[in-house]
A protein has these predicted regions:
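C-terminal beta-rich recognition modules with glycine/proline-rich loops and embedded aromatic residues
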Residues: 460, 539-548, 553-641, 677, ...
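Solvent-exposed beta-strand/loop surfaces of large extracellular or lumenal domains
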Residues: 660-685, 705-713
Length: 970
């Protein structure tokens, strides 16, 4: 009877909605007024509180119109904007149809003397250690954790040691070759072993099964013992020098200039590990680390593949072991190995490298070892979190002199070309390799704990804020094909992404956000939260990326993770990565799922912050108190109980941004907080807590929309080079609390174009199912016949983003300050500035007599497309007012935006560069299935096509695949 009544009410709601639209419009927006230090672009909020005509309110995203590089450089120029200058920045609340570009807002900016406020270098709070917090119950969290641990202990530890023994001349008998990106013919080898060590350590801290902990402990000990055995082979006394042979002695400049990087060369290099230098520990000879000093390019066959990236993974693994295992001897040995390798890095970079940032690039590269150039190279200069690990080492170990060397080494990984603009709040993120740069920022922030230099804190804070406002998708991820695109262009980037399935036709490719980026953004967010634990924006984002992309990135049916995450239209998660060495995301993936609780609680001497709501038991050893949080996950209500101990402290509970209605806190049955401000913390002041004290939190999930900042107006067609034009429309995702909701059965953008009521009354929340394990507490909602489930639970052919037709209130009026009937060309102006800048870069390179670097700033085909669209757009920009309609202006702006966002750096191949390869592949597929050589060539060619489509392939890979196919087709 109850079910029939619910259906009747639902049917009646639909009938009423069809008869009359319940309009809701923005009635009020909080004022935006900021002070900015002279020489910096303003820090503008990425979200503002709006109040609607029905009295309700929420945070909405803002797109500010100062994001072009030229505009930001002007804002940060003290000659143009000296102290005392006041100016305005225009923007729009996205997803609103009051005007074509959204609801207009204005920020008042005042330029002042001084600097931004910077916290003390000692964080206000630290997360409770992983070993002191356990996840409880039978839910998706514990299911994923146990799946990960079981996979981890099934992996042969000797396989992880193969490359080390091979590199140091030890017998490899009984040690199976590694595979994936740690294979003997992959120069990133060692990265997977580093992730493996981190995962062992984190799993050890999280594991609830003593038998499994014993296996983890045994494997950790074997890794540490054998790595130290390898490292000790580099302890070589040199009588002539009167000291040990060190990193600075390895490869003198004359030798370095002649050093080659082919596989035959590396076979030679590994024959004498005594030359590597005291303390060198890596799965590949030391030549790999020093070739980057000659600015050798990313090329697995002939040169390098991110030398210091793999070093970082191994350092991080050793540090994680040292800080998580309960065996003191093993912990000390792991830390000693890491310290000795950290000092090798210091020795090499201190004595053999330098920084020169002025002059032309050929001048900057005239001598080996200019770190300005080294760390600014695509992938070859990818260093992971070297700075973070070295900074952590300086905190954990060493004499005063060694600590100073380690923090100096950490800051040797500063990238001035990237850091300097960020420190001024100028967006240096655009077009960079995403996962190359996120951990560099985390490292800078970690070094701030020791050096106290505001430069490092500022650049980290500015970077994080830019990500939130300009680059993130609804699930919390970033990037497309491993790259950051233009700011505020997520929808265009998503809708124009294409790939080849092995033939010559191009197809939409809805796999975008690299999982490594989610892992590293979560880590950066956790670090920032420690300095400002009362600012709920950090843990709001952490909850978003954890609840969606991270938890959704492991296959609950069998252990597999994803590289690029499924985002957009009719997207399927590309499962794979069954080992830490499979790819970079196989490595971060095996860590992700054994540490969900690492940021659940932050503490200091007198306060605990409850940052995440999940079923956990927290042992606050400093206070002698055990707190048990009892809830389902995802949680709309939770109970925190003092299970053991007593103590005096305050408790702060996060009010999520989405908790706009009904958030209530009770202490021992008495209401202590209600009508709380979203995106804040509620404090229960310092009191004497005792066993069985109970805090109850009610936080009903609300329905809301998460819009992309740009409208959807074009998508690739299935014929090569074709595209389909659409009327510009805001595109967004349905949200249920922190969860992105997705549905199946949507095949194209026409089907993904939907009507949505302004007050969201046609979105019906259905609550949660029962279930256990991976399917426990599964929420759903419905909208016009489609049932939506959380993104983390969807696998195949799911759609997250929809073109949403939300009627604007015809009676709504803008405030007088924002009312305007003029044609808005602001976005077209910003795009033309980008096109102008890129054209100038390309022409400057063309004019060089000696091409340094050897490739142009922008790849040929994409550059030509941009110039063609810019030529079409410029006349509309120059035309008198009224000659062109807003629709015509927006159309050319959209086409130019699409052209800009599909450009690639000049060192990367484009899809057009695979024409011959794809033709050969089609022919090769006609050969007999029993031709093993052909099958290997076909498999490799398919992999290359995927890599190039994703943006991570290289011309040498295309050439190698082409040659292999030609050989089998003879």
């Amino acid at each position: 009877m109850k079910k029939i009544l619910l259906l009747s009410v639902f049917s009646l709601t639909l009938l009423v909605a069809s008869a009359a639209i319940s309009y809701r419009s923005i009635a009020k927006v909080e004022r935006v007024s900021v002070e900015t230090p002279v020489g910096c672009a303003p820090r503008l909020p990425y979200q503002v509180w709006v109040t609607y005509s029905d009295g309700k309110g929420e945070f909405r995203q803002v797109k500010w119109l100062n994001s072009s590089e030229a505009t930001e450089k002007a804002e940060s120029n003290p000659t143009i904007n000296p102290v005392g200058t006041a100016y305005q920045v225009r923007g729009f609340i996205i997803g609103d149809n009051t005007t074509a570009n959204g609801y207009p807002v204005t920020a008042e900016v005042q330029v002042v003397e001084g600097a931004w406020p910077v916290p003390n270098r000692i964080p206000v709070a630290e997360p409770l250690p992983l070993s002191q917090v356990s996840i409880d119950g039978n839910n998706r969290l514990t299911w994923n954790r146990d799946l990960d641990i079981d996979q981890l202990i099934s992996l042969p530890v000797k396989q992880q040691l193969y490359n080390y023994r091979d590199t140091y001349g030890l017998s490899t008998e009984g040690y199976p070759e590694s595979d994936g990106w740690d294979s003997p013919t992959t120069k990133l080898k060692g990265h997977g072993s580093g992730h493996y060590m981190s995962a062992l350590a984190l799993a050890f801290a999280s594991c609830q099964d003593e038998g499994k902990k014993d296996i983890l402990r045994k494997n950790i000990k074997m890794m540490v013992d054998e790595l130290r055995q390898c490292q000790e082979l580099t302890f070589v006394w040199d009588e002539k020098l009167g000291r040990y042979w060190e990193a600075r002695d390895f490869a003198p400049e004359e030798e370095l200039r002649q050093m080659q990087g082919t596989w035959s060369d590396f076979d030679r290099y590994k024959k004498d590990c005594r030359k590597y230098g005291y303390g060198y520990l890596n799965a590949i000879p030391a030549q790999h680390c020093v070739l980057i000093e000659m600015y050798r390019a990313y090329n697995n066959e002939s040169w390098v593949w991110a030398p210091y990236y793999s070093v970082h993974k191994q350092l991080a693994g050793l540090i994680d072991i040292a800080t998580n295992i309960d065996d003191k001897e093993v912990a000390e040995k792991a830390l000693l190995i890491a310290k000795d390798m950290g000092l090798w890095v210091w020795n090499r970079l201190h004595y053999r490298t330098y920084v020169k940032s002025d002059g032309r690039q050929d001048e900057r590269r005239a001598r080996p070892g200019n770190r300005y150039e080294m760390w600014n190279m695509y992938i070859a200069g990818e260093v992971g979190g070297m700075a973070e690990s070295l900074a952590r080492l300086s905190e954990l170990t060493g004499t005063a002199e060694e600590k100073a060397h380690l923090i100096e080494a950490a800051n040797c990984f500063d990238s001035p070309a990237f850091f300097d603009p960020l420190a001024k709040n100028v967006d240096a993120i655009r077009t960079r390799h995403a996962n190359q740069h996120i951990p560099m920022v985390t490292g800078a922030l970690r070094s701030f704990r020791t050096n106290g230099n505001a430069y490092y804190y500022d650049l980290a804070q500015n970077f994080w804020t830019m990500i939130q406002g300009r680059y993130r998708y609804a699930m919390g991820g970033v990037g497309n094909g491993e790259m950051f695109r233009q700011p505020y262009s997520q929808i265009t980037s998503m809708c124009t992404n294409v790939t080849s399935w092995g033939g010559r036709e191009l197809h939409p490719e809805p796999t975008l956000n690299e999982t490594c980026c989610a892992y590293n953004l979560a880590k950066l967010t956790k670090e920032l939260n420690g300095f400002n634990p009362d600012d709920a924006r950090y843990m709001d984002y952490y909850e978003r990326v954890l609840s969606n992309q991270i938890i959704g990135s492991v296959n609950p049916n069998r252990y597999q993770t994803v590289y690029q995450y499924a985002v957009g239209l009719n997207a399927s998660k590309p499962w794979g990565n069954e080992t830490p060495q499979a790819t970079c995301c196989g490595g971060t993936g095996v860590e992700n799922h054994v540490k969900y609780q690492e940021a659940a609680y932050f503490v200091n001497d007198n306060t605990i912050w409850v940052a995440l709501y999940m079923p956990t038991t927290a042992h606050w050893e400093q206070k002698g108190v055990t707190i048990r949080q009892e809830c389902q996950w995802p949680a709309e209500q939770t109970t925190l109980r003092i299970a053991k101990g007593k103590g005096q402290f305050a408790m702060k509970l996060r009010v999520p941004y989405w908790a706009t209605e009904g958030f209530t806190v009770k202490l021992n049955g008495k209401v202590v907080a209600k009508k709380c401000k979203p995106c804040s913390y509620v404090e229960i002041p310092v009191r004497r807590w005792k066993e069985n004290d109970v805090v109850e939190v009610v936080m009903p999930f609300t329905k809301h929309l998460d819009f992309g900042p740009d409208k959807m107006e074009t998508a690739p067609a299935y014929e090569k080079g074709g595209k389909t034009e659409y009327a510009p429309m805001w595109t967004g995702a349905f949200m249920y609390g922190p969860m992105v909701m997705a549905t199946t059965g949507i095949r194209n953008w026409d089907e993904a174009t939907i009507d949505v009521a302004p007050d969201l009354s046609d979105i019906v929340l259905m609550g949660a199912s029962e279930g256990k394990g991976a399917d426990a507490h599964l929420y759903t909602l419905t909208h016009h016949g489609h049932t939506f489930m959380p993104d983390y639970a969807g696998n195949d052919h799911v759609t997250h983003y929809f073109r949403m037709n939300i009627p604007a209130d015809p009676n709504a009026q803008l405030p007088a300050s924002n009312a305007s009937s003029a044609i808005d060309k602001s976005q077209l102006r910003e795009l033309l500035l980008i096109a102008k800048s890129r054209n100038e870069e390309q022409q400057a390179w063309n004019a060089l007599m000696v091409k340094v670097p050897e490739y142009a700033p922008w790849a040929t085909h994409g550059f030509s497309r941009m110039m063609e669209q810019a030529a079409k757009a410029q006349p509309l920009m120059d035309a008198d007012e009224g000659r062109y309609s807003q629709e015509e202006i927006d159309k050319v702006a959209g086409a130019l935006n699409a052209a800009i966002n599909t450009m690639r750096p000049g060192n990367l191949p484009e899809l057009e560069d695979m024409e011959e390869l794809q033709q050969l592949l089609e022919k090769a597929k006609l050969l007999s299935d029993t031709n093993e050589k052909a099958n290997r060539a076909i498999s490799y060619a398919g992999m290359v096509i995927r890599y190039v489509s994703d943006g991570s392939g290289t011309m040498d890979m295309i050439q190698r695949a082409t040659n292999q196919l030609k050989e089998v087709l003879k």
